[in-house]
Swiss-Prot record:
Gene: VMA6
UniProt record, GO biological process: endosomal lumen acidification; Golgi lumen acidification; proton transmembrane transport; vacuolar acidification; vacuolar transport
Subunit structure as annotated in this protein's UniProt entry: V-ATPase is a heteromultimeric enzyme composed of a peripheral catalytic V1 complex (components A to H) attached to an integral membrane V0 proton pore complex (components: a, c, c', c'', d, e, f and VOA1).
Topology of this chain in the membrane: Peripheral membrane protein
Protein name as annotated: V-type proton ATPase subunit d
PANTHER family, sorted: VACUOLAR ATP SYNTHASE SUBUNIT AC39
Subcellular location: Vacuole membrane
Protein family (similarity comment): Belongs to the V-ATPase V0D/AC39 subunit family.
Length: 345
C-alpha cells in the first residue's frame, strides 16, 4: 500500500532516476572505451551511449581530458537539477540535503584560496555547481571565522553546523580550515542521518542510513590516517571530528581517535568486517569507491525508495571519474593502467 502513496508524490521521480540508472555505462561499454586509440575515438564511442552528442560542439583539435570531464559533469548536474525541480515536500528537502556537502567543500575552497591570495574568479570556477549559493563569492572578504559566519553564512543552510566551530579557530590557516571543514561535515552527516530517520519512510530509510553510515566511516578512516602526520591533533580534537554514525561507531571510532600510528588505525579496523582488509593491499580510495558502488547497486534493488537518487548520483560521479581516467590514460599513452576503473553495473 505504501507504494500507492509513494507514487503520488515520487513515482515520476523514481521512474526518471531508474531511467538514468539504466543509462549508466555497462562493462561492455567500458571495454569498448578502453580500446580507443585517441580522444576522438573515445568521443565517438561515447556518442553511442546515453551521453549522445554531448561533445558535438568540441572540435578534434581542442578535445582534452579536462573538457571531457567538464562536459560529462555538466550532464550530471543538469540531470540532478531536473529531478530536484520535479520534487516537493520531504523529497525536495532530501535533494537539498545532498547539495549541502558540496556547499561545505565550496566554503573550504573559497577560504583556502583567499588566504593564499589566489584569483577570486579562478577559485569560483573550481567551486562545485551543486554547492553554489548566492553569497559564496563574498566569502573572499572574510578575515576570521566570526565575520565569515555573520556576513556570509548565517543565512545559508550551513549556519546550524557552525555552532561547534567557533572554539576552534583563532585564525584562518590551512590546519584550522581543514578542522572546520571536518566539523561541518560531521554535523552535516549526523543531521542528514537524523532527517532520514525521522522523515523518510522504509525502505529508503534503511538504505540511506547504510549509505550515510558508509560516508561517515570513510571520513573517519581518512581523518584518522591524515592526522597521524600532525602532532597538533590530539585524541580529544580527533573525537570532535569523527562522525557518531556508521559501522565504526562507537567502538572503532573511539580506537581511531586514540590511534597514534598506522598500526593503531589498522587495529581499530580489524574488528569491522567491511573495512578489515582495506589497509592491507591496494589503494585505499579504490577500496572505498568499490564498496560505495556495491552499496549503490544494492540500493537499486529496493522499490518505492528515494534513496535511488543518492545511489544514482554517486554512481554517476564514479562514472565521470572512470571516463576521465580512461581519457587520461589514452592521452598519456598509459595503456597498462587503463583498466584501473571501477564498474559494478
Amino acid at each position: 500500500m505504501e507504494g500507492v502513496y509513494f507514487n503520488i508524490d515520487n513515482g515520476f521521480i523514481e521512474g526518471v532516476v531508474r531511467g538514468y540508472r539504466n543509462g549508466l555505462l555497462s562493462n561492455n561499454q567500458y571495454i569498448n572505451l578502453t580500446q580507443c586509440d585517441t580522444l576522438e575515438d573515445l568521443k565517438l564511442q561515447l556518442s553511442s551511449t546515453d551521453y549522445g552528442n554531448f561533445l558535438s560542439s568540441v572540435s578534434s583539435e581542442s578535445l582534452t581530458t579536462s573538457l571531457i570531464q567538464e562536459y560529462a559533469s555538466s550532464k550530471l548536474y543538469h540531470e540532478f537539477n531536473y529531478i530536484r525541480d520535479q520534487s516537493s515536500g520531504s523529497t525536495r528537502k532530501f535533494m537539498d540535503y545532498i547539495t549541502y556537502g558540496y556547499m561545505i567543500d565550496n566554503v573550504a575552497l573559497m577560504i583556502t584560496g583567499t588566504i593564499h591570495d589566489r584569483d577570486k574568479g579562478e577559485i569560483l570556477q573550481r567551486c562545485h555547481p551543486l554547492g553554489w549559493f548566492d553569497t559564496l563569492p563574498t566569502l573572499s572578504v572574510a578575515t576570521d571565522l566570526e565575520s565569515l559566519y555573520e556576513t556570509v553564512l548565517v543565512d545559508t543552510p550551513l549556519a546550524p553546523y557552525f555552532k561547534n566551530c567557533f572554539d576552534t579557530a583563532e585564525e584562518l590557516d590551512d590546519m584550522n580550515i581543514e578542522i572546520i571543514r571536518n566539523k561541518l561535515y560531521k554535523a552535516y552527516l549526523e543531521d542528514f542521518y537524523n532527517f532520514v530517520t525521522e522523515e523518510i519512510p522504509e525502505p529508503a530509510k534503511e538504505c540511506m542510513q547504510t549509505l550515510l553510515g558508509f560516508e561517515a566511516d570513510r571520513r573517519s578512516i581518512n581523518i584518522a590516517l591524515n592526522s597521524l602526520q600532525s602532532s597538533d591533533i590530539d585524541p580529544d580534537l580527533k573525537s570532535d571530528l569523527l562522525p557518531n554514525i556508521g559501522k565504526l561507531y562507537p567502538l572503532a571510532t573511539f580506537h581511531l581517535a586514540q590511534a597514534q600510528d598506522f598500526e593503531g588505525v589498522r587495529a581499530a579496523l580489524a574488528n569491522v568486517y567491511e573495512y578489515r582488509g582495506f589497509l592491507e593491499t591496494g589503494n585505499l580510495e579504490d577500496h572505498f569507491y568499490q564498496l560505495e558502488m556495491e552499496l549503490c547497486r544494492d540500493a537499486f534493488t529496493q522499490q518505492f525508495a528515494i534513496s535511488t537518487v543518492w545511489a544514482w548520483m554517486k554512481s554517476k560521479e564514479q562514472e565521470v571519474r572512470n571516463i576521465t581516467w580512461i581519457a587520461e590514460c589514452i592521452a598519456q599513452n598509459q595503456r597498462e593502467r587503463i583498466n584501473n576503473y571501477i564498474s559494478v553495473y
